[in-house]
Amino acid sequence: QKDVVPWKFPPKHEFMYGEWLREQFDKGAIPEPTYDPDLAILLSQLRENSINLFGPEATEVIEPVPMTDIRRAIKESLPGLIASIEGDERNVILTLARMWLTSSSGRICSKDQAAEWAIPKLAKEHATLLEKAKKAYLGDYDDKWEGMETEIIELVNYLKRSIESSLNI
């Protein structure tokens, strides 16, 4: 708690687990504590959406995250996210849609909700690709991105420009 209260950017985490890290953990690779801009977004979501099972509510122990820090986290996370696209196309595309929604509206929502918001704002070829990513995320489509590299790059570049425009950078 001392790493996030009082609030300061970027926040630091001791340990973070997600299914995407399972293989790394199974091999015994446990990352060191680190400063992570994306944690600002996660903590904001935690305050907004957590369901308390025991102890104090998240809103009682974690301070609000200013929107300026959420926007800063998006800006700082954007290059690394795009660089990690190979083999993680669905997640990257959906995360970019979510970044665009948040940087445009200040709302944080699920990846499929962000895709729903973004799809009508996209050209047909981009919307089709984002729809595939959303369906794969929901388990209604098999992730098959081979042969779509050019289309993926074009969509990623469009989403990147849209995010940067929303952030005024």
Please name every model-derived segment:
Residues 71-133:
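Extended, basic/helix-rich recognition subdomains
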Residues 1-86, 168:
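Conserved NTP/Mg2+-binding pocket subregion across the NTase superfamily
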Residues 107-169:
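Structured mid-to-C-terminal alpha-helical surface segments
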Residues 36, 67, 86-90, 123, ...:
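Amphipathic, non-membrane alpha-helical segments in soluble helical-bundle scaffolds
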